[in-house]
Amino acid sequence: MTRGVKSKAQRRGQAPPPPKRSPWLERGLFGLAAITVVVVGAGLWRMSGDDRTTSATDAGPVHVHGLGVNPLDGALFIATHTGLFRSGGGESTSARVGDSSQDTMGFTIVDADRFLGSGHPDLRTDLPPLLGLIESTDRGRSWEPIALLGEADFHVLRSAGEVVYGYDSSNDRLMVSGDAGRTWEEVERPAPLVDLAADPKDSQHVVAAGVSDISQGLYESRDGGRSWDRRGEQVGLLAWPAPGRLFLVDGGGNVFLSTDTGRRFGRRGTIGGQPAALLGQGADELFVALHDGTIKRSTDGGSTWTIRSTP
């Protein structure tokens, strides 16, 4: 099932590091880690059944990797180490989608009922340990491999129309697809990535947060990741939901907003904990996952937060 991978030539050198070690590595939130998969539940491929299937022993979404809102019904989807969960509008808890415990590391909703993911399979399948890019068109109940099966593990996965960006942590490479994930090209990455966000007006304009053993920084590309300029030392989870609204949440839970694509940031508020995932919807609506599985929501650009969902 693997399709069209083209290699990039020599990478450029990284920017000079600041003197102190990256707090992202010290916190252990990011970096290149060993693959771990937890066995809970049944196989995921060609699964059927209701959106909301769970059991009394299900711990819920306690190790969150990604968030998405289905534009069809406004439901919040929570991608975790042990499966995909859904919290409908007006609900304060979430329920497992199907009965799979797939480790969904990368997750993005590109259109109504169309989800993209990556990560590691439920161990009761016969799939390889790296899922490459997978797609669901039934709200996460079943998934099909699209590309790079057995070859890539996208810990960062972002879509901008037909353009999809993925950071493959297993091979420390940034990849881009111009055809919704069917074929991929390896492009230059400025550093091992923490996160990436695309300009909602220009899919070739992206900002990335990167971190290495001794350095960290924010980088900007206007050619789809083929070249980069360093913008500063700030690093964190990113969301770019509207033009001129680039949000960053750092490792301490502080929320920042930039109106000039990351050159300058102003502090907005705090989420009250360490962030695990960030999602932007419109100019001022944000969702953030904490490491205990709590999902918070802000409707004022990160100044104040309320609890949207609990495990």
PLM feature segments, named:
Residues A56-F85, Q102-G106:
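Beta-strand-rich domains and repeat architectures in extracellular enzymes and scaffolds
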Residues M1-W24:
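Terminal targeting segments of Actinobacterial cell-envelope proteins
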Residues L72-G74, A112-D113, G161-E162, S203-Q204, ...:
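Short coil/turn segments that connect the beta-strands within blades of beta-propeller domains
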Residues T82-V97, P129-A147, M175-E188, Y219-R230, ...:
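Asp-box/BNR beta-propeller loop motif
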Residues D99-M105, L149-F154, R189-D195, G232-L238, ...:
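Short coil/turn segments at the loop-to-beta-strand junctions that recur within blades
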Residues V40-H63:
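C-terminal region of N-terminal signal peptides and the immediate post-cleavage residues
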Residues G83-F85, H120-D126, N171-R173, S212-Q216, ...:
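Short glycine/acidic-enriched loop and turn motifs that connect beta-strands
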Residues G68, F107-T108, R158, A197-D199, ...:
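Conserved beta-strand position repeated across blades of beta-propeller domains
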